Structures are given as structure tokens and as C-alpha cells.
Amino acid sequence: NTGKKTSGNPIFPGWYADPEGIVFGDEYWIYPTLSLLYGEDEEIYKADLERQTDAINPEYNLQTHMDAFSSKDLVNWTKHPRVLHIEDVPWVKYALWAPSIIQANGKYYLFFGGNDIQNNDQYGGIGVAVSDKPEGPFKDALGKPLISQIINGAQPIDQFVYRDDDGEHRL
């Protein structure tokens, strides 16, 4: 025992997946996918549960937003709720997930998967939203998916964006 305070496990309450960890300035940030209800009042999700979509899994109807978490010390975390919501991305109806974020040219770009398409007859794919701050709010940047087709048999989901050694951003 080092006597140092730790954040514990889990580091914040909730049921999250696909975390993207990044440092902006002197703050650590985590952008995860909201997976399932976990100790929250189901009443706040009632409308999402009752929505009719073509989701292959009804629980995808709950994935209507993304939260973010920030910390200066990796011990104490602040929740930034609903940094991105499907209301701000008109082409997404369900399954907003797998965030990846970069900072470029004074803006923050949050890439995400939307609608879990299973074939090219469905509409969805990889989107990008933009904000002036890492805590959002993020708004759809294109009005359509950046990548909307299944390519080489791969769904357009689970993207990762980074800045390469040459300074170029890659997806």
C-alpha cells in the first residue's frame, strides 16, 4: 500500500463500454458508450424504451446519448451528461456508440457510430460532431454519416481517429 488515494473500480457509476481516454490540456477525459440502465430511474428512459425503430436489439433504443467524464487527478471524476444526443444528429435514430475524439484547429471533433446498420439498404454509419469545448455540447458536423456503407464486409462502426507523426489526422 503506497498510501495514495485511488479512484477505485469502477471509476464512476454507470454501465459504460467502449471508453476513449484522452488528455486535453491538464485534464484527463473519458468518452464512453452508454450501454444499459444501471441504478438509474427507468422513468427518464421511458420514451426511449417505447420508441419504435428497426433496431435489431431493443436495448439499442436506450443508446440515445453520450456522457463524458473529466478529472485533473485520475481520482475525482466529473460527469458531463449528454455531451451528444441523437436530437443533435438527425440521421441517428438509435445506437449512438463507440466515441473517438480529437482536438484540431480550436475545435473538438467527436466521431461515433450510429444506427448499427447490417446492410447497405439501411441508413447509418460513422458520424462526426463538433464542439468548441471538450464537454460539449456536440452537434452533427455533416448532416449525414461520414462513412455510410459496409466496405469489405465491415460495418461502419468502432472507428478510431488519431493524429499521425506527420501531423495528419487519420480514421
Functional labels for PLM-detected ranges:
Residues N1-L171:
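Carbohydrate-active catalytic/glycan-binding domains of CAZyme proteins
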